[in-house]
Amino acid sequence: MVDREQLVQKARLAEQAERYDDMAAAMKSVTELNEALSNEERNLLSVAYKNVVGARRSSWRVISSIEQKTSADGNEKKMEMVRAYREKIEKELETVCRDVLNLLDNFLIKNCNETQHESKVFYLKMKGDYYRYLAEVATGEKRVGVVESSEKSYSEAHEISKEHMQPTHPIRLGLALNYSVFYYEIQNAPEQACHLAKTAFDDAIAELDTLNEDSYKDSTLIMQLLRDNLTLWTSDQZDDEGGETNN
């Protein structure tokens, strides 16, 4: 029998060493023990996979950019090599995303009871995120499917968060941040993105007195990111120049 506490300890250690693949493997094993995760364990799982998938997302963007330049140069041999490398990174990214989505569907979301609104929103947001990461690299029918799944997860999380969580809650704010990025980057719907981000920001500002001392820093940081994205997106709509979105 694997010692749960030892696995969690290993994940903490791996995080300090910035060995995120090890961290993810440890937290995957914890999740597969099929017991509810504590807030700390939930965050360890999230941080581990965010870094594992983040490295692949970053690599994919770099290689895609090189692929476009190589295509313009017309160097067939180099083009073939770059394409093959992009596809290799894509496969890695897809494997990581499918791993997370399996954990969410088979254990984490499934085991949330009717009163665990915070956990349910956290996991549904995560599900929306990992389908969004798949949508970033998918094309054709495959893309349509993952976009639909992402939208469905975000939408369900959004409804629960509006009904059961304070507008200043960092999980509700983080969901609004990522859901609005989904509208802007994946759905190419800047008006919906701006509306969602602005509503979340304004609702939180209106209830600043409900800010929990423990989560004050998290909440205000996400509010700042929402505002930064709004500023970027509204200026983009005015001059149509791209920029780097916070997500």
Swiss-Prot record:
One of its GO terms (cellular component) is cytoplasm. Its main location: cytoplasm. Gene3D superfamilies: 14-3-3 domain. Belongs to the 14-3-3 family. Adapter protein implicated in the regulation of a large spectrum of both general and specialized signaling pathways. Binds to a large number of partners, usually by recognition of a phosphoserine or phosphothreonine motif. Binding generally results in the modulation of the activity of the binding partner. The record marks 57, 132 as: Interaction with phosphoserine on interacting protein. It comes from the Eukaryota. SUPFAM superfamilies: 14-3-3 protein (SSF48445). This is 14-3-3 protein gamma-1. Expressed in brain, gill, heart, intestine, kidney, liver, ovary, skeletal muscle, spleen and testis. It is found in: Cytoplasm.
